[in-house]
Amino acid sequence: AGLATSQWQALATSLINDFVYKGVSEYVAWYESALQVNAVTELLNTATQRERALVTRVEKGDLANVVLTEFKANILQQRLLLAELKQKRDAHAQMLSFYWRSPKGDMLIVDEANPPKDINWPFWVGNGQLMTLRNALRNHPELDVMKLEQQVVNNKAALASNALLPKLDLKASVARDIGSGPSNLDGTETKVGLSFSYPLGNRKAKAEQAQLQSKQRELEHKLTSTEQAITQRFEQALVYWGQARDIVALQSENAALAKTLSKVEKTRFDAGDSDMFVLNARAQNEIKAQIQEIKAKVDLLKAELTLYKEAAMLHSLNN
């Protein structure tokens, strides 16, 4: 009963770990989409204000109407992008409500349009956390379940081996002679006997023992393979996390540069030193760069989350 309880506890830990991973993954997916919607909306509002200024210039004859048409076409592309991002954001918000529940278990409505400024991310990773996560691999619930299964099989194998052993019984009996013959005996007589028996049907017992020994070898191999697989998954997640940190730095630099170039191009256009084609290209690059920067930052969160997931440490949130 104790082994069965321990097995269920290890299995429950594994299930909770997977459930938390899916829920938090859905949260960061919604968070990414919501941030991207806000970024594009802000740029689109700025572009709309600029459109009004261009309309005024066209009406005054300072600017050709075709220039305004090109600008409107660019704004339309931004609005289409915004609509797609909103669709993605709302879909993730709907999925998130399945995981986001009240203490009573009721699904909560997610305010999909207003992501928090600080999500208080609990899964950040540093050198100390990496050491803790590595140590946790030895107590992974997948391994615990298999070790407990091994223990059950080992116990059965021990019982099967004992069943094949011959049985020795030492018996002692005491008798008193109360006969009436001429040589009547007084007192008692003690007899000692040794009984040796070998269990019948030992072929069946041997077959059962061989089957259990085969199961022991199978579980040992499976345990070793699982340990290696868990370690490999963690190491892969660690490599991805390191790369994600580098990409965040590069994408942030790229976004800042794209913003500067777009601002410079607007100044050049107003001075008559640039055309609408280049201006639109700079604006599109700025939007793409901001979207990629947000994606890179959220990818880093996902990478940290994966490290905790592979170490089976997500269940600790419930403790």
Give the predicted meaning of each segment:
Residues 15, 19-40, 49, 92, ...:
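Amphipathic alpha-helical coiled-coil segments
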Residues 1-15, 154, 163-190, 197-210, ...:
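Small/polar (Gly/Ser/Thr/Ala-rich) solvent-exposed segments
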